[in-house]
């Protein structure tokens, strides 16, 4: 009997072991993997940088340049080749705008053609895709389609105008399915739903998208997720979001619209982010949803490995691959880049007597843009002021001299890096101020404009830096030329500028009379984008910073196109002066110090010139000097509140004091009565 029982137990154990092994194998068979390769904010960076002259795509270890789309191609192709059936390549938007290559986007669509050749499968639209307006974006897409297939373009929260026809060409491409809200990909037996959204912050800095608008990305995501769950029956949900992530003020935690999506729509399994140019070495985990971003400009390629089992999607691991001189360029892709470089020369630069790889200047130091005084900011703003005067200043009429010029940090897109040789090409200089489209000629590049302001309005313009920038960030920091000013961050918002000095024609500075009695007009200059913002800044500051650009007679300018600098007033219409052309012209006129026929960057730009001075003080003189009604009104309100508080305290205290006095008198009376009775006894 014991022998039989022992044999029976052994047989049961063997059967259970086989069952467990079989279940384990089945579980492993059910677990599937998916690799998501991602980039974002490539911004037409097809060459390694910077400087471009030192980019050596086919040799390793001999330059310090980073990026380069042909290097990106090498990495992505190698990763896809390992397991193409389990790999999905996604970009988080802003594949356009930032280099000379985007100037031929409407004819050649180099960026989309290259991304298709590399193997990208899905791309969302960023704010810079709309820099050439909806009609221009339609031209870019049609140009790409005329030359072959393109990746899936995804935009779920775009809203077209029902009354304005200027977005009809783009809407037609949506109706054809060239751009769509989402796409289903099948990889490794998995149904993967990918959709794209534009963040509200990105939409805010896409003024040329009008009349296109954008719906709330979170509400859009909830709607798409329902479709994925109920109709499409997907296994994995990926959101390509051009929303962004930023460090909180504590510099420890994160915030941003990409994080909001993961938190508010937990059904999303992965957020492939963009817009904020944030390099995340590791994903930000929000309720088990990885939020990704790979810096910008092709500096990194991100690789996320997922494991999917029984409906659960989990991150297995993540890797960031740096794109630098340790990666050899893909020869096919580099050949395409070379072809597009020649197209840029033929179509855009030769009319200006330029070439993309032409050495244009040399520098013995780096020029960088900062959220502070910066030598590059000084250079760019000086170039604006100088260039406007080349076309409009007549010494016989002193009021035609440009007194101040301003530029936004958001318009300055790259540093000027000395590198090993110090030689700067046309392409390096273009990358500094590459953005925009003509208001009249519809050609790439923002145009310069000039107008007149009163002294108090100049102060209001500088208050954008002191008061709007702390609330809105990098894009609202201003670089200035022709002026110096001090500000006190402890003063009342919108009235923090203490005083301003402006330079005369000889470069000598003197205080600017900021009183309302000063009726003189001062000529100012900027690009049309910044000018539009200056005109509108009063609207979103409650009227506190209302600025009215005027002509030389003091008449308000209704249409800013009439304020554009005209390169040839004798020709019909307005011949726009592009900022990028003006910038090159300014540099072209620098002295050739060493006699090699190349202009040298002046030593005066080695360091920032300290045009903006922050003075933290609670001294009354620095709190009230040149104060406006904003400060006096706030001070009066505070005084009224203090007096009211004193009155309230006294009002409450009076009956209490009366009660206290009455109690004291009563106590004294009681003591006297007790004392008298004690004596009698």
Which residues does each PLM region occupy?
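Bacterial N-terminal signal peptides that target proteins for export
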Residues: 2-12
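Acidic, metal/ion-coordinating pockets
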Residues: 27-327, 376-383, 396, 469, ...
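Exposed boundary/loop context
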Residues: 6, 86, 119, 189, ...
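Bacterial N-terminal signal peptides
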Residues: 11-20
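Catalytic centers of hydrolytic enzymes
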Residues: 28-39, 44-48, 53-75, 117, ...
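Hydrophobic alpha-helical segments with strong N-terminal bias
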Residues: 6, 106, 438-439
């Amino acid at each position: 009997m014991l022998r039989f029982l022992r044999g029976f137990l052994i047989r049961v154990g063997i059967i259970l072991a086989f069952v467990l092994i079989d279940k384990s194998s089945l579980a492993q068979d059910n677990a599937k993997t998916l690799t998501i390769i991602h980039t974002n904010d490539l911004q037409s960076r097809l060459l390694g940088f910077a400087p471009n002259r030192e980019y050596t795509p086919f040799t390793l270890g001999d330059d310090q340049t980073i990026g380069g789309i042909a290097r990106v191609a090498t990495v992505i192709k190698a990763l896809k080749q390992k397991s193409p059936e389990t790999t999905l390549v996604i970009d988080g938007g802003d594949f356009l705008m930032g280099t000379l290559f985007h100037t031929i986007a409407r004819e050649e669509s180099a960026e989309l053609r290259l991304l298709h050749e590399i193997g990208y499968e899905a791309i969302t639209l960023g704010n810079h895709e709309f820099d050439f307006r909806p009609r221009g974006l339609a031209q870019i897409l049609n140009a790409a389609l005329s030359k072959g297939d393109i990746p899936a373009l995804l935009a779920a929260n775009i809203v077209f105008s029902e009354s304005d026809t200027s977005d009809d060409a783009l809407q037609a491409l949506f109706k054809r399915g060239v751009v769509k809200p989402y796409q289903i990909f099948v990889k490794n037996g998995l149904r993967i739903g990918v959709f794209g959204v534009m963040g509200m912050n990105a939409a805010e800095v896409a003024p040329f998208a009008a009349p296109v608008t954008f719906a709330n990305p979170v509400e859009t995501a909830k709607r798409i997720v329902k479709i994925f769950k109920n109709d499409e029956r997907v296994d994995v949900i990926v959101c390509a979001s051009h929303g962004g992530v930023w460090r909180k003020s504590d510099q420890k935690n994160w915030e941003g619209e990409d994080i909001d999506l993961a938190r508010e729509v937990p059904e999303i399994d992965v957020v492939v982010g963009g817009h904020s140019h944030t390099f995340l070495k590791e994903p930000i985990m929000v309720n088990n949803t990885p939020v990704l971003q790979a810096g910008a400009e092709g500096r990194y390629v991100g690789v996320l490995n997922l494991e999917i089992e029984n409906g659960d999607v989990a991150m297995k691991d993540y890797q960031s691959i740096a794109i630098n001189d340790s990666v050899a360029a893909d020869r096919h892709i580099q050949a395409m880049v070379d072809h597009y470089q020649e197209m840029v020369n033929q179509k855009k630069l030769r009319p200006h007597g330029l070439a993309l790889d032409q050495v244009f200047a040399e520098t013995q130091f780096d020029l960088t843009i900062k959220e502070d005084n910066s030598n590059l900011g000084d250079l760019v703003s000086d170039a604006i002021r100088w260039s406007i005067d080349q076309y409009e200043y007549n010494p016989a009429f002193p009021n035609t001299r440009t007194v101040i010029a301003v530029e936004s940090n958001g318009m300055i897109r790259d540093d000027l890096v000395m590198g090993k040789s110090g030689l700067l090409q046309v392409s390096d200089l273009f990358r500094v101020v590459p953005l925009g489209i003509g208001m009249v000629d519809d050609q790439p590049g923002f145009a310069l404009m000039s107008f007149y302001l009163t002294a108090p309005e100049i102060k209001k313009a500088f208050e954008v830096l002191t008061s709007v920038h702390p609330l809105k960030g990098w894009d609202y920091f201003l670089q200035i030329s022709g002026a110096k000013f001090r500000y006190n961050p402890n003063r009342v918002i919108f009235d923090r500028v203490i005083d301003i000095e402006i330079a005369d024609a000889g470069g000598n500075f003197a205080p600017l009379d900021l009183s309302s009695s000063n009726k003189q007009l001062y000529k100012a200059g900027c690009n049309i984008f910044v000018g539009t913002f200056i005109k509108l800044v009063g609207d979103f500051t409650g009227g506190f910073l209302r600025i009215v650009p005027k002509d030389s007679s003091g008449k308000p300018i209704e249409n800013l196109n009439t304020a554009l600098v005209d390169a040839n007033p004798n020709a019909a219409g307005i011949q726009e002066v592009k900022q990028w052309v003006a910038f090159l012209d300014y540099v072209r006129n620098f002295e050739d110090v060493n006699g090699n026929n190349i202009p040298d960057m002046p030593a005066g730009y080695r360091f920032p010139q300290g045009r903006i001075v922050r003075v933290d003080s609670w001294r009354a003189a620095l709190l009230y000097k040149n104060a406006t009604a904003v400060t006096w009104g706030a001070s009066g309100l505070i005084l009224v509140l203090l007096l009211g508080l004193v009155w309230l305290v006294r009002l409450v205290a009076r009956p209490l004091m009366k009660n206290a006095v009455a109690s004291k008198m009563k106590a004294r009376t009681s003591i006297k009565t007790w004392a008298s009775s004690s004596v009698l006894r």
